[in-house]
């Protein structure tokens, strides 16, 4: 009997070279693991450094803003004091005594005499009376002032005098 030759099945086995040993696979893994750990550690150190720089920068920004706020508060306080002083100055300048003194000394105005004061009703039927002072027609209303300044005062006084003259004559005739 003749037998057919058998086919041998061959499964190739990994060839182990003399350079690699079974342990070297583990050491490569350890090296890769250690390299990863070093990279991770370096990344964490860099991240900590960046976070530290960021915190320093933000702290400096907060300090700068704080100094600006303090400066603005001081400026506000100064401006409020100046405002109060200016309000006191305005009140002093508006005082009736000062206005009367300036009117008589600098502007040359005089107090009206009793016979120069006439009471005229403000509006018909209102019942209120307005005090109006006039001057004699021969004298100007304002003396001692510059001609350009007194022109409108003189014109006003003359117009008032002409307007009140009929009422004055009617009051004298009654």
Swiss-Prot record:
Membrane topology listed for this record: Single-pass type II membrane protein
Ranges per topology, Cytoplasmic: 1-38
Extracellular side of membrane: 60-174
GO biological process terms held by the UniProt record: FtsZ-dependent cytokinesis
Main location: membrane
Any single GO CC term annotated in Swiss-Prot or TrEMBL for this entry: plasma membrane
Keywords (A to Z) from UniProt: Cell cycle, Cell division, Cell membrane, Membrane, Transmembrane, Transmembrane helix
The keyword Calcium belongs to this UniProt entry's keyword annotation: no
Subcellular location: Cell membrane
InterPro entries in the record: Cell_div_FtsL (IPR011922), FtsL/DivIC (IPR007060)
Sequence intervals crossing the membrane: 39-59
Protein purpose: Essential cell division protein.
Family (UniProt): Belongs to the FtsL family.
Protein name, UniProt field: Cell division protein FtsL
Organism: Moorella thermoacetica (strain ATCC 39073 / JCM 9320)
């Amino acid at each position: 009997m003749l037998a057919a030759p058998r086919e041998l099945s061959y499964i190739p086995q990994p060839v182990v070279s003399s350079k690699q040993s079974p342990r070297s696979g583990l050491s490569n893994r350890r090296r890769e693991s250690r390299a990863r750990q070093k990279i991770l550690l370096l990344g964490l150190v860099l991240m900590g450094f960046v976070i530290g720089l960021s915190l320093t920068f933000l702290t400096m920004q907060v300090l700068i803003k704080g100094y600006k706020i303090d400066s603005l508060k001081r400026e506000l306080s100064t401006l409020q004091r100046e405002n109060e002083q200016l309000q006191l100055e305005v009140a002093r300048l508006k005082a009736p005594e000062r206005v009367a003194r300036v009117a008589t000394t600098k502007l040359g105005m005089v107090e009206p005499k009793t016979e120069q004061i006439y009471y005229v009703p403000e509006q018909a039927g209102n019942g209120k009376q307005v005090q109006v002072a006039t001057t004699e027609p021969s004298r100007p209303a304002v003396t001692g002032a510059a001609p350009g300044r007194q022109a409108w005062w003189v014109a006003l006084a003359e117009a008032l005098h002409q307007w009140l003259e009929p009422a004055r004559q009617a009051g004298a005739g009654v």
